[in-house]
């Protein structure tokens, strides 16, 4: 079967030039409010300036079931600092003002509390491109599907190596912008080796759709970025960027982002 996308994606103008350049897009994640709100916003702007094609802006949540220890510690610190959802929307505005493209990554509960349509409206008004919802499945996403149509936002759902063919097709059909491929089973975090399950998962998506596929959960080096960029449309980096910011501040964050941006281009140079 082939899954067709129902509407044009906001993110297509980002992925298409990357495909033309024979490279993957670099997608960088940071949580709002770590180590504090102003620094987190500066850090996200630094991602844009250092070569990130898309910035994932995290909404800290008190029960982050899929986050590894690095991100969990950072989000806990942000929550202790009093971060609010409106701070995430302000970060999206700052990224947009810097010429970047932002998507928000959030567990579903904060969106429900804010109001699904109100969140979509305010995210679009801030210049956001879409929403990644790691704990929301399309079957339970009726309100979000409707709100994303009303406000012109992309919706990024997750697929995993364990996804059945039926679940994969349903998820891909509901997604717009890109599909987030979790390259390992379990929680996120930087790893020395990249999962061998990821290329197979990307292939399974491509058998049924031409929607871009972003691979996350583990990248922390130029070499790994180049490796994943060899088969994925997007290389997603989270824990390694959070660690760089926490350990070395904006200088270390910029250096790692530039290294990763070189990594996704390395494959293009070699091909």
Curated annotation (Swiss-Prot):
EC class of the enzyme, as a word: lyase
Keywords assigned: Amino-acid biosynthesis, Aromatic amino acid biosynthesis, Lyase, Tryptophan biosynthesis
Catalytic activity: (1S,2R)-1-C-(indol-3-yl)glycerol 3-phosphate + L-serine = D-glyceraldehyde 3-phosphate + L-tryptophan + H2O
Keyword Cell division appears in the UniProt entry: no
EC nos: 4.2.1.20
Catalytic-site annotation from UniProt: 56 (proton acceptor), 67 (proton acceptor)
GO function term, MF aspect, one: tryptophan synthase activity
SUBUNIT field: Tetramer of two alpha and two beta chains.
Source taxon at top rank: Bacteria
Homology family: Belongs to the TrpA family.
Role according to the record: The alpha subunit is responsible for the aldol cleavage of indoleglycerol phosphate to indole and glyceraldehyde 3-phosphate.
Protein name (database record): Tryptophan synthase alpha chain
Entry's Gene Ontology cellular component terms: cytosol
Coiled coil (residue ranges): none
Cross-referenced InterPro entries: Aldolase_TIM (IPR013785), RibuloseP-bd_barrel (IPR011060), Trp_synthase_alpha_AS (IPR018204), Trp_synthase_suA (IPR002028)
Pathway: Amino-acid biosynthesis; L-tryptophan biosynthesis; L-tryptophan from chorismate: step 5/5
Species of provenance: Mycolicibacterium paratuberculosis (strain ATCC BAA-968 / K-10)
